[in-house]
C-alpha cells in the first residue's frame, strides 16, 4: 500500500474570486445533511486516511499556510470552555486533531503549475511511491475509500503509474486532461496510449478515443494518481530544464516522460467525484452534499 499522498492546494483561487482572496480553496465550507459543517480539506483527508494513507502532504502558498494551520488548531484554548459545554464542538475538534497528526504543510513559493507543486513536495515524498489527489475534488460517497483503494491496488499489481479516470462527453474534453487507453484483461483497467491536456473536440475525436467507449465519450483525469518512485527523477529533470519565463509546467510533462520509460494504466472507478474549483462547481457540490442523505 502506498503510505503517502500529496494534495495540491496552493492556487490563488481566482475561479472563486473574491472569496478566494481571504479563504483558501481547501477551507471552503460544506454543510452536511446532519447539520455538521466541514471543509474540502477535511473531506479529502478523511477519505485518504480511510484508504490507509498514513501521511498527507498538503501543498499550500506561503501566505495561506498560517490560515490552514490556525484552522487545524481548532481555536485551541480559546474555544476550550465552549467545547466543554457542547459535545458536537468537541467531536469536531477531535476530528481536526486526528487529521492534524497525519498532515504536513508544504509551501509552493511560486505558482508554476501542478507539476511544480508536486515537485515542491519531493522532500516529503523522500523517494517513495505516491498518491496525488487534486485539492478541489471530493470523492463520493463521503468517507468511502473504495476508489482510492482500487487505484492503489492496481498500482501494487503493476508497479507502474495508474491514473483514475471518468468519462466525459466530446463537448467537455477541452476542460480536462484526456487520456487514450486500450482495454486489458482486467475489468476497468486500460493501458495508457497517450494523453493530451485540454484538447479541442476535433483533436480528441481524431486521436484520443478509447476503444470500447461510445463514440461521444472520452476518458478524463478524475483527480487521483498513483506514481512509482521514478516520478521524482522525472520531475527533477523537468525542473532543471524548465524556463520560468515559459509559464507553468503541468503534471502531464512528467506523465509523458514516464510513459517513455514504462507502461502506465488507467482505472475507471465505480465512484463519482465532486469538483469545487469554480463558483458554479462549488454551488453544485454544496447543494449536493447538503441535500443528499446517501453521501
Residue ranges and their predicted role:
Residues 2-89, 103, 144-146:
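N-terminal glycine-rich phosphate-binding loop and ensuing alpha1 helix
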Residues 76-98, 198-216:
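Charged, glycine/proline-rich intrinsically disordered loops and linkers
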Residues 67-68, 92-184, 236:
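Conserved beta-loop-beta/alpha segment of the NTase-like Rossmann-fold superfamily
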Residues 5-7, 58, 132, 163-164, ...:
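Structural beta-sheet core signal
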Residues 10, 32, 61, 135, ...:
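Cofactor-binding loop segments of dinucleotide-utilizing enzymes, especially the Rossmann-like FAD-
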Residues 27, 103-105, 161-163, 264-266, ...:
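Conserved beta-strand scaffold positions in the cores of enzyme catalytic domains, especially
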Amino acid at each position: 500500500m502506498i503510505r503517502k499522498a500529496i494534495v495540491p492546494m496552493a492556487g490563488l483561487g481566482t475561479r472563486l474570486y473574491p472569496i478566494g482572496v481571504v479563504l483558501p480553496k481547501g477551507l471552503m465550507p460544506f454543510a452536511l445533511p446532519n447539520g455538521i459543517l466541514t471543509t474540502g480539506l477535511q473531506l479529502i483527508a478523511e477519505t485518504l486516511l480511510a484508504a490507509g494513507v498514513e501521511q498527507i502532504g498538503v501543498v499550500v502558498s506561503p501566505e495561506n499556510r498560517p490560515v490552514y494551520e490556525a484552522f487545524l488548531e481548532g481555536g485551541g484554548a480559546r474555544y476550550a470552555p465552549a467545547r466543554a459545554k457542547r459535545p458536537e464542538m468537541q467531536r469536531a475538534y477531535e476530528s481536526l486533531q486526528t487529521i492534524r497528526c497525519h498532515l504536513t504543510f508544504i509551501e509552493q513559493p511560486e505558482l508554476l503549475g501542478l507539476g511544480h507543486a508536486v515537485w515542491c513536495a519531493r522532500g516529503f515524498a523522500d523517494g517513495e511511491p505516491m498518491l496525488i489527489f487534486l485539492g478541489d475534488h471530493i470523492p463520493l460517497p463521503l468517507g468511502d475509500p473504495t476508489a482510492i483503494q482500487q487505484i492503489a491496488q492496481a498500482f501494487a499489481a503493476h508497479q507502474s503509474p495508474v491514473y483514475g479516470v471518468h468519462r466525459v462527453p466530446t463537448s467537455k474534453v477541452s476542460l480536462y486532461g484526456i487520456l487514450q487507453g486500450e482495454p486489458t484483461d482486467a475489468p476497468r483497467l486500460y493501458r495508457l496510449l497517450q494523453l493530451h491536456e485540454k484538447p479541442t473536440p476535433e483533436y480528441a475525436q481524431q486521436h484520443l478515443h478509447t476503444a470500447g467507449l461510445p463514440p461521444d465519450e472520452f476518458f478524463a483525469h478524475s483527480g487521483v494518481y498513483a506514481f512509482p518512485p521514478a516520478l521524482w527523477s522525472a520531475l527533477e529533470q523537468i525542473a532543471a530544464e524548465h524556463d520560468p519565463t515559459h509559464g507553468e509546467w503541468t503534471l502531464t510533462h512528467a506523465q509523458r516522460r514516464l510513459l517513455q520509460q514504462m507502461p502506465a494504466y488507467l482505472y475507471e472507478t465505480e465512484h463519482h467525484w465532486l469538483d469545487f474549483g469554480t463558483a458554479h462547481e462549488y454551488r453544485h457540490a454544496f447543494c449536493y452534499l447538503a441535500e443528499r442523505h446517501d453521501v
